[in-house]
């Protein structure tokens, strides 16, 4: 199936008071994400991947070892990453964390505060472009990971519960070179914890 750019689940200016400006979403969603969709569709046309789901393409082309596959993987994975990213955020000043998620984070990391600290450290410590993730491993354990470029948890058989884009285009308009501040703001103000909990 062809890649399609999903509509944002909120208005472009809905997150502005929470630290993600209308301008950032216009560039990030309408231009960057759209480019992954458009390029991905061009690259899969006439290949074995045409008609496959994004998830199948990501898993099938990761570490495929062929240069011809790398462009397909990069665009498919970044399309998938961004589609999740928009859903993992939401408007509203007081976003409650569901009890089951809070309990799981405390059991896995000691406290919600420690989870946030470790997640932000993973994102800040990712050299160059990439993503920070909270994942559920195949054994059900919750883990914090970071990946380079467009690599995502699908590549490792993990379930993505939360992901934060740490490519510079995701934060430079609003935070300039202050990636740690962007990550802290993401965790404290932007995350839709109901969505995260629904992925468990």
From Swiss-Prot:
Positions annotated to bind Fe cation: 28, 82, 165, 169
GO molecular function, one term: metal ion binding
Keywords tagged on the record: Iron, Metal-binding, Oxidoreductase
Top EC class, one word: oxidoreductase
A Pfam family it matches: Sod_Fe_C
Catalytic activity: 2 superoxide + 2 H(+) = H2O2 + O2
Binding note for cofactor: Binds 1 Fe cation per subunit.
Cofactor(s) in the UniProt record: Fe cation
Enzyme Commission code: 1.15.1.1
Entry superkingdom: Bacteria
Keyword Transit peptide: no
Annotated family: Belongs to the iron/manganese superoxide dismutase family.
Role, per record: Destroys superoxide anion radicals which are normally produced within the cells and which are toxic to biological systems.
Known partners and oligomeric status: Homodimer.
Name of protein: Superoxide dismutase [Fe]
The species this protein was found in: Rhodobacter capsulatus
